[in-house]
């Protein structure tokens, strides 16, 4: 983050976006590296969450705004000298993998990720998303191609494992209290004593997990297990975070919160990192990813990096109660392709823009309950 971010946080506070303001203030203070300021922000955040969980009639604790202003003022003075540059993290060139028996093969594929960037990998189950992620994480040997880990001078398996964190869809069970596991994870990363306590408390607050820290694995839902696993991994400060279907066990609100939080932290000066994630939640991933690739039967059919080369028509997905014949009549002689999957219609046109397609239907005064421009969305390939 940079000093201008203090103004963004002030706007969140002004307009009542308190949860986002708290999360971003914690990020802002973490980037300063000032332990006393971080601790102050953690305590301020804790008061906010206690008030929120108590279902108080007051949306925020007393002195919440004045304390926030004081914290931001202190952080801004330190932040003025902090900056980081985006660096290449990983690049894979024509990597491929075939499992023994020849049942499935990942076709040659190219990907690259820099610090602060997010790569989204989408596709149906069983089409190669997990295989690709495990290859990039160094968990599977390649049949062909090359992976370069740009920040490692000697990318041996041990160095790669410490450089990259991989969170699978099925997370292994934790034993003991959740908070104790986080303390242990921080100690593995060389964080001890008061600094260990500070960073664990910070991560609990940052992901809003403090009220669950005293529980055990069997006492929390699958969604919270995912969030605790993310907290555990982030304490180890990986340079590349790879997540396999992290949204599968989360509700809609938690999905977007986790994604935006990961992006915020990936771009922070404390530990700028790259993120690669797989998912079937296309809309959520496309909103946050810098690059999205679509994999089908082991082959990369689409990458948003070269979308202009493959997309020659515009497409709009929408929901309406009118008939197919009514829709066709609206466009008259203009050439369109109309598809219906039982729930949504899709209009594809090489001549009309998405705005023109929607405009014609609005002018015709037909009822539209949902629409989305999917011209450059991987939704077109499902």
Language-model region placement:
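Q-loop/switch helix immediately C-terminal to the Walker
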Residues: 170, 176-190
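ABC transporter nucleotide-binding domain
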Residues: 264-275, 280-345
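Helix-to-loop junction immediately C-terminal to a conserved catalytic motif
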Residues: 137
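Catalytic Walker B motif of ABC-type/P-loop ATPase nucleotide-binding domains
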Residues: 241-245
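Conserved ABC transporter NBD signature motif
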Residues: 145-160
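The feature captures the beta-strand-to-loop junction immediately N-terminal to the Walker
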Residues: 122-124
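Conserved ABC ATPase "signature" region
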Residues: 82, 183, 195-212
